Structure formats: structure tokens, C-alpha cells
């Protein structure tokens, strides 16, 4: 007897031109999946017009050395306006003949392209999986036109899906309530720890017992940086002298006043601000010089920064929102606090300040993610077709839309 051929998969996600946390995830997942089986990767190259992107000034800069194995067929990539890139994308799909198409979802800007890809992939006989990083980008949720567009059009995509992947039970409920997706079709695969940063030096010792705090990542309203600054301001001069706070991140959604708040803090002399998107090498330096990472988020499905901090074995103070509690549940260096409270944040910092940096580990690795993904893909390859070809909103995958 001849064993049946293993299913072939194409992974679709953002490339490095519009570098983001989802870019790092796509490359990490791509490397992990390719280490187990044959995989192809299709990258989204131009996400939106650069002038409309909050970080448009750095679009196309070489800020990261992340890469895929040379033997992984890759097309980089598909542009938002399609044009010749769409033709080359369709040819790539036809050459690869996938059994499964895995789409990374975090923003409505990819919806029209994902509709095209899912339509063509299914005509080639492939099943479609959507992996949610957010139900929708927080900024887009607050944009009436974009939110309405996604609400009206996304059922056409999700009806075509054989399965969905999220990173936590919290996210499963989020996509159920947000898109009326049957929870039975949603597989929880925890976010793997980030290990793409090559550690290039030794961890710096604490000078004079100073605890170095790090806020890292995009500065947005949902990130709660103002609560962290408020926590610093609650310290008296003696206590503040025991800390240094470094803020590293690009400003989005008109959050310049929050950066100004840090500059005008009563302890501004204890705060360093690096107000831009930094390279991998710079990020490595900041994490190696950090004793405690603080995530004062007001809302979060998951956090790439959390998994990056855990990759460095650093203590983390995080708010108990979204899937953060589940992600940090088995991490001994995690300290959870209530959101929207500078005083609770300060208490968490005080409790965690003496935890030994660089000594903790997180159990879920990329190899675990790859095994879970391929098991899901294998289960779909033997399943009967259970998705609709038409655009009827009463599809069995999705309940009737409101």
C-alpha cells in the first residue's frame, strides 16, 4: 500500500516591508511549519499606501534580519492594489497546488485580497484556515467606515473557512461574539515564545541596585503607557531613584500627548524615550539591559512583546486583560495586575522588581505550534467539504448575521 501524500500548505501573512509584530509571527510560524513538512509562503508586500500607514516613514527600511529557509518556496509579494502582483500571486498558487491555505488575520486592509486568495484556493481544492491575532485592529475598530466594511464583507471570507485558529480561550469567545463563528470550528494554539532575536551580549548587571523597567512596542491608546507614567509619578523621589524607565516605541493614533506626558513627568530624569520603531539589534540591547518588562495594556488579544520578554526570560508585569493571563499562566516570572490603575501597576512593579532577570522560561515553543498546526491540517485533509460556495449569510459556519 502507498501511504497518502501529506497535505501541502501555503502560509499567507505580512512581509518585512510593513514590518510589524505579525510579520515576526508569520516568519516564525513559517520556519516552524517548514521544519516539519513542505510549506510555501505568500507574503503581503504593500499593505496600504505608505502615506496612510501610521509608521509610513519607515516603510521599506531594513530593520529586521528575520528570514525563511532558502528551500521554502516564497513569493514576496501581493500588493493591496493587486495589479501585476495579483497575477504573479495567482500563478504562484497554481504552481504550489496547496491542500490548505493559512491566512493571518489582524486587519481589515487585507480582506479584499483574502477574498481573492480564498476563492482561488478553494477552486484548486484547498481548505482555508484563518488565524486571528486580533478580531480587528483596535484603530480600525474605532473607525466607523472601516469597522462597518469589515462587519459587512468579512462573512464572505469566513464562510469559506474550514477552521479557525486563535491563541487563547479568550480569543475564541472574541471571534465568536464578533463574527458569530461556531466555537467548534475554532482551534486554540497558544502563541509560541519569540526567539528570533539573536542574543549578542551578556546581560548587564544592575548599577547600584537600580531596576530598569522597559515599555516596548507601539504607543497606542490601548497600550496604557499613560498608566505606567502615572505609576512612576506616584513614587516619591527616593523610590523613583531606584528605577529607570525606558520607553521604546513608535507613536500611533495621535498619541504624541502621551509621549509629552512622559517628558513632563515629575520623574522625567528617570525616563528615557526612544520614540521610533527600532531594529532587531537595538531591541536585543534594550532587552539585555532590562530587569522588568511592563505591559500596562487596556485591551489585548495577545502580545508579541510578552512572548519576546519571555523569550529573554525576563520578569513581566502585565494587566489582566484579554488573553494575557492565559499566555502567562505557566510563566513563573509573570505578575498580573488590574488594568486602568496606576496604583495597581505600581504595586505589581514593587512585587516583581527583585525577580531575577534572565532566569525564567516559557514552555510553548515553535515546535509545539508546528505540531498542533499540522495535526489540524491533517484532520482537515480527511474531512468532507463543509463550507458554502455561495454568499448566503445563513451559512452553517456562521449563524445569521444581525
Where are these regions (language model features)?
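Conserved donor-binding/catalytic core segment of Leloir-type glycosyltransferases
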Residues: 205-223, 229-232, 246
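Membrane-proximal helix-turn-helix segments that form the acceptor-binding/catalytic region
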Residues: 119-123, 146-164
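Carbohydrate-associated surface elements
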Residues: 170, 192
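Acidic donor-binding loop of glycosyltransferase active sites
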Residues: 162, 285-301, 314
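Nucleotide-activated donor-binding/catalytic signature segment of Leloir-type glycosyltransferases, i.e.
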Residues: 258-277, 281
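Short hydrophobic beta-strand element within catalytic cores of glycosyltransferases
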Residues: 315-320
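Conserved acidic donor-binding segment of nucleotide-sugar-dependent glycosyltransferases
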Residues: 330-331, 335-342, 349-354
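N-terminal strand-loop element at the rim of the active site
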Residues: 13-19, 30-95, 250-254
Amino acid at each position: 500500500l502507498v501511504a497518502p501524500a501529506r497535505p501541502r500548505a501555503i502560509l499567507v501573512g505580512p512581509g518585512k516591508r510593513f514590518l510589524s509584530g505579525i510579520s515576526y509571527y508569520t516568519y516564525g510560524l513559517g520556519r516552524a511549519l517548514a521544519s516539519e513538512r513542505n510549506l510555501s509562503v505568500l507574503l503581503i508586500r504593500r499593505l496600504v499606501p505608505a502615506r496612510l500607514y501610521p509608521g509610513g516613514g519607515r516603510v521599506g527600511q531594513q530593520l529586521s534580519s528575520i528570514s525563511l529557509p532558502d528551500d521554502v518556496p516564497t513569493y514576496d509579494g501581493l500588493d493591496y492594489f493587486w495589479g501585476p502582483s495579483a497575477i504573479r500571486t495567482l500563478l504562484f498558487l497554481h504552481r504550489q497546488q496547496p491542500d490548505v491555505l493559512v491566512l493571518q488575520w489582524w486587519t481589515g486592509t487585507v480582506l479584499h485580497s483574502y477574498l481573492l486568495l480564498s476563492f482561488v484556493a478553494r477552486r484548486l481544492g484547498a481548505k482555508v484556515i484563518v488565524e486571528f491575532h486580533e478580531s480587528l485592529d483596535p484603530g480600525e475598530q474605532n473607525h466607523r467606515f472601516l469597522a462597518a466594511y469589515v462587519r459587512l464583507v468579512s462573512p464572505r471570507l469566513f464562510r469559506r473557512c474550514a477552521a479557525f485558529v486563535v491563541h487563547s480561550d479568550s480569543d475564541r469567545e472574541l471571534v465568536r461574539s464578533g463574527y458569530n463563528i461556531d466555537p467548534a470550528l475554532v482551534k486554540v494554539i497558544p502563541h509560541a515564545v519569540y526567539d528570533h532575536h539573536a542574543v549578542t551580549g551578556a546581560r548587564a548587571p544592575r548599577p547600584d541596585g537600580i531596576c530598569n523597567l522597559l515599555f516596548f512596542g507601539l504607543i497606542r491608546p490601548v497600550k496604557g503607557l499613560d498608566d505606567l507614567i502615572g505609576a512612576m509619578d506616584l513614587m516619591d523621589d527616593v523610590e523613583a531613584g531606584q528605577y529607570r524607565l525606558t520607553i521604546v516605541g513608535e507613536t500611533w493614533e495621535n498619541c504624541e500627548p502621551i509621549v509629552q506626558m512622559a517628558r513632563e513627568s515629575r520623574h522625567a530624569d528617570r525616563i528615557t524615550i526612544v520614540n521610533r520603531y527600532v531594529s532587531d539589534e537595538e531591541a536585543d540591547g534594550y532587552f539585555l539591559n532590562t530587569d522588568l518588562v511592563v505591559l500596562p495594556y487596556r485591551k489585548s488579544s495577545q502580545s508579541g512583546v510578552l512572548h519576546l520578554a519571555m523569550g529573554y526570560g525576563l520578569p513581566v508585569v502585565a494587566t489582566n486583560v484579554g488573553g494575557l493571563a492565559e499566555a502567562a499562566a505557566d510563566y513563573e516570572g509573570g505578575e498580573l495586575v488590574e488594568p486602568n490603575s496606576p496604583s495597581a501597576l505600581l504595586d505589581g512593579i514593587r512585587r516583581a522588581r527583585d525577580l531575577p532577570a534572565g532566569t525564567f522560561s516559557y514552555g510553548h515553543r515553535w515546535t509545539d505550534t508546528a505540531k498542533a498546526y499540522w495535526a489540524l491540517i491533517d484532520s482537515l485533509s480527511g474531512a468532507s467539504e463543509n463550507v458554502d460556495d455561495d454568499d448566503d449569510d445563513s451559512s452553517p459556519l456562521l449563524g445569521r448575521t444581525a
